[in-house]
Amino acid sequence: MAESMVTDPIYLDETAKANGAKLDLLNATMLGVSASLGVLAKAQTGIFEEMDYNAIKAVVDAGSAPITFPTGTQLVNTYTGKDGKAYDCPWDVVQPDDTAEGESGATVPAMVLQMHYATLYDLQFSAYQAFYVVPDGGLVAGTYNVKMGLNWGNNVKTDAVYQFTLTKAAPAGARLTGFYNAPDVVPANWKVYVYKDQQKSELLETCSVTAGSAGTNLGTFLAKENGDLNGLHPVGYGDNRWWKSAYRQYLNSDAAAGAWWQPQDKWDMKPDQADTLPGFLSGFSDDFKSALSRVKVVTYGNGVTDDGSAVVTYDKIFLPSLQEIYCSPQVSGEGSYWPYWKERTGAKTPQALWQTYPLRITRDLAQRTVGRNVRLRSANRGGGSSAFHVGSSGGVSTWTGIIALRSAPACKITKLA
């Protein structure tokens, strides 16, 4: 079934007036391409007309998107929640004049769309990561210890040693997790959890942690991976790297609940919501899903648990970066700025981090007066566990990977396969 489009840019009333001339030109342009579009989207407030995504892609590929779909235009489709309730889902044209690179290396014209409202459901960027993979042969019942090789927050101190006791053997391939929120939780409240596998199909044991060096040493914790131990940053608060995030898998899947998540490395653990949320794309029509292409997305590492270099992924749906939403990035190169956000905020230069901007508030798809916290894909380069987000009051700051938030994701409309 074809989707719907509204051509009025609603992001600011003033912008609607300023774009009047553009919309007149839009109307004229659409007359010229109506044979291929099959319909005419009239440039009048509140007019919705059915559109064909193949026709939209043809306009983009011809280089006509900046005239036909100026910044702020909305393409409106339908999103159906897991309860079967359907919502009009506007996508803002945030950059009508872009390019996209496919997995083959081909580069084509592209138009960038971003959801105007926040997604319906909260999701962790990343679960707490495992700190130890039980080797072949398993771990026998007994006492084990780990040493701290870093200072972190109030409670992680270099050279401190902590022990825990397994009351039964842990099988090969089991994952040890724990030390959750370590810098902010007193050691007396730390725990170690033994899971059968990365899917957390069975919690085999929960162990108390105490100060002490009894038993077998498993290694020394650093912020990053060290020997047989994962880095304490992603262990304590989740991972902040887009390439391995649960959020990336969720946004790019239409699989049923329980079927869209797979571990991305040996430390990765299933997020809490994976068994109850279907993949994000499951809420859209086949027409919309078939219009999406995997495009090159660049995201930098954090410089703590990795070397901080750029990582390339190919995604149909992706979270925006700081740079794309016209904020001052910690590192340049995660895309180019989208003019929508410059116009929406009225900013003359990219806006500073750690400040609050009410014009950046993203509201809920179902409750359109309610502001939501929305994830970005940019990692906080000062640590291995926090990624940026825009808060429900418009603040631009970070939150740890394990916190479940909404998002306002983006996609690129192109002629790529």
Give residue spans per PLM region.
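A general secondary-structure boundary signal
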Residues: G20-D24, G142, V161
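Short, low-complexity N-terminal tether/leader segments at secretion or assembly junctions of large
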Residues: M1-L31
